[in-house]
């Protein structure tokens, strides 16, 4: 039987359908409130508003649970590779061996970008941030695929594959241009993560030998960042897509949203904070500053809009961080890691943080891993974009396949 919630406005009662969720909280359908009650609902930041129906990702923030298509994020990070998870998000199921091989071949086939794109890079000054270059380059792909300006359902999967394939190439090109080195072409004999590292660190005169520990760590990071419900950048992609904008334009809007320091740029801010703290002996001083309402200092890498428990992604990254630093001989002498571990230990025992349910989030350890890998801080958000493109494309595809999809237009 249908359930309803009752809303009383100026003495009149309105029955609002309660929509049953397959998992998690049920939802009150308020779509007819404005027409029937002559009122709008007000929810700044969409704190209590579901903007769409989705079967891609589920989060229980109180319990620290994150699942993609029903699979726990920790299992995916430990047992899958990134393109398996990409397939899962886009198609709804993990691939068979044959499906996986076909999918990876398609991604490899589409990894090259048009040579004319090189001219676009040359219009940027040498000091340009790689995110600025990437944002422009991804948007410009619309010019190379004019057929997708009026895309059809048959294009959804091929478009997703093209985007997943080309984003790492553009990301590496953005980095190479920013440091004045020649672009490195993709090598289809390498897997997805190896290929990206190759394009980042090889030069025409020097081959880059991929360390398997580094590769596996980056693979986990990509998986952990692949999708995360209707966050700011994903919602931006959906809103842009709801107007019928071409997929390259939609993804470029997601990149723009991700660039913000409150979203994808947070791990770079964490690194800067750890550097500012400087030494474990100063941690109590900065803990006190974080508690002081009159002090602008914020303890970055703690707390999350959704999670009121330990972020499951942070738990995986903490162990991954130790594995990488051990492999590189930095486990006992990396000052940023030592500060981070002690800062976490102190904060988790402090009543101020316990009462407010402020736990380490995914940004707390990822930057330390990147720095150890030799990835500069201005590339952190670029790597986030590589991973999140998979989620953006899965969400974009799901939106266009939804018969109830409408153009987004908040009041």
Curated annotation (Swiss-Prot):
Pathway annotation from the record: Carbohydrate metabolism; tricarboxylic acid cycle; isocitrate from oxaloacetate: step 1/2
SUPFAM superfamilies, alphabetized: Citrate synthase
Molecular function terms from GO: citrate (Si)-synthase activity
This protein's record includes keyword Transmembrane helix: no
Family matches, as InterPro entries: Citrate_synth-like_lrg_a-sub, Citrate_synth-like_sm_a-sub, Citrate_synthase, Citrate_synthase_AS, Citrate_synthase_bac-typ, Citrate_synthase_sf, Citrate_synthase_typ-I
GO biological process: tricarboxylic acid cycle
Name assigned to this protein: Citrate synthase
Catalytic activity annotation: oxaloacetate + acetyl-CoA + H2O = citrate + CoA + H(+)
More about this protein: Citrate synthase is found in nearly all cells capable of oxidative metabolism.
Superkingdom of source: Bacteria
Listed EC numbers: 2.3.3.16
Record family assignment: Belongs to the citrate synthase family.
NCBIfam families: cit_synth_I, PRK05614.1
Keyword Ion transport: no
PROSITE patterns according to UniProt: CITRATE_SYNTHASE
Active-site positions on this chain: 304, 363
Any one Gene Ontology cellular component term annotated for this protein: cytoplasm
Keywords from the UniProt entry: Transferase, Tricarboxylic acid cycle
């Amino acid at each position: 039987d249908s359930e309803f919630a009752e809303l009383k406005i100026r003495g009149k009662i309105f029955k609002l359908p309660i929509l049953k969720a397959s998992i998690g909280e049920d939802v009150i359908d308020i779509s007819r409130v404005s027409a029937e009650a002559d009122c709008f609902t007000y929810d700044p930041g969409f704190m209590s508003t579901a903007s769409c129906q989705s079967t891609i990702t589920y989060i229980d923030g109180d319990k620290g649970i994150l699942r993609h298509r029903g699979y726990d994020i920790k299992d995916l990070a430990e047992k899958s590779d990134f393109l398996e998870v990409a397939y899962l998000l886009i198609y709804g199921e993990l691939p068979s061996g044959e499906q996986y091989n076909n999918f990876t071949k398609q991604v490899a086939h589409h990894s090259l970008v048009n040579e004319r794109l090189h001219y676009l890079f040359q219009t940027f000054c040498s000091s340009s941030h790689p995110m600025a270059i990437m944002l422009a380059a991804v948007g410009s792909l619309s010019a190379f695929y004019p057929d997708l300006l009026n895309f059809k359902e048959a294009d959804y999967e091929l478009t997703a594959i093209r985007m997943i394939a080309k984003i790492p190439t553009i990301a590496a090109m953005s980095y190479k241009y920013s440091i004045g080195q020649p672009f490195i072409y993709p090598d289809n004999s390498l897997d997805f993560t190896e290929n990206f590292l190759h394009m980042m660190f090889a030069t025409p005169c020097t081959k880059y030998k991929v360390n398997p520990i580094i590769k596996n760590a980056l693979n986990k990071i990509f998986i952990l960042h692949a999708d995360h419900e209707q966050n700011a950048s994903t919602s931006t992609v959906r809103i842009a897509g709801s107007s019928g904008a071409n997929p390259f334009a939609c993804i470029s809007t997601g990149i723009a949203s991700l660039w913000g320091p409150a979203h994808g740029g947070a791990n770079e801010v964490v690194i800067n904070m750890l550097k500012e703290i400087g030494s474990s002996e100063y941690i109590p001083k900065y803990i006190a500053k974080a508690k002081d309402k009159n002090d602008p200092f914020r303890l970055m890498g703690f707390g999350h809009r959704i999670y009121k428990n330990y972020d499951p992604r942070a738990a995986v990254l903490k162990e991954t961080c130790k594995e990488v630093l051990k492999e590189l001989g930095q486990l006992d002498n990396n000052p940023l890691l030592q500060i981070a571990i002690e800062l976490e230990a102190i904060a988790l025992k402090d009543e101020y943080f316990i009462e407010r349910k402020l736990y380490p989030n995914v940004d707390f350890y990822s930057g330390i891993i990147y720095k150890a890998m030799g990835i500069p801080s201005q590339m952190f958000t670029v790597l986030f974009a590589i991973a999140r493109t998979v989620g953006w494309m899965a969400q974009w595809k799901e939106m266009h396949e939804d018969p109830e999809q409408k153009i987004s237009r908040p009041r």
